[in-house]
UniProtKB/Swiss-Prot annotation:
The modification Glycine radical is found at residue 102. The keyword Signal does not apply. The gene is grcA. This is Autonomous glycyl radical cofactor. Keywords: Organic radical.
Length: 127
């Protein structure tokens, strides 16, 4: 369990009024802020704090979402037939806009190779 504390009394003056997160499970303390002697984010053993008195402070945490690999999703709401028709008859679709790599782009402004790539990537039979 993680407990937030503010040190109110300590043998080490650098610890006075500093804020820490205590990890009872691992016997560690992470510095949130201190006037001097400790860096923000520094992790020390709980014993390294020595004799201290403290008051608990509420800790709010937001869930951390970690996505590795830079994943993203482009949503295009249309049919394969519409895109294939736009390749063959671009004059019928002058305003057809799609999402590619996070950008909105006119389908007709893409090269034929890029248009085929979009159709292939957008409409797959299976993963």
């Amino acid at each position: 369990m993680i407990t937030g504390i503010q040190i109110t009394k300590a043998d080490n003056d650098d610890l006075l009024h500093s804020f820490w997160l205590l990890d009872d499970e691992n016997g560690e303390a992470r510095c949130i802020c201190a006037k001097k002697g400790f860096e923000e984010g520094q992790v020390v053993s709980r014993d390294a704090l020595g004799n201290i008195e403290y008051r608990e402070v509420p800790v709010e945490s937001k869930p951390v979402v970690r996505v590795e690999g830079g994943q993203h999703l482009n949503v295009n709401v249309l049919s394969r037939e519409t895109l294939e028709d736009a390749v063959n008859n671009p004059e019928k679709y002058p305003q057809l806009t799609i999402r590619v790599s996070g950008y909105a782009v006119r389908f007709n402004s893409l090269t034929p190779e890029q248009q085929r790539d979009v159709i292939t990537r957008t409409f797959t039979e299976s993963l």
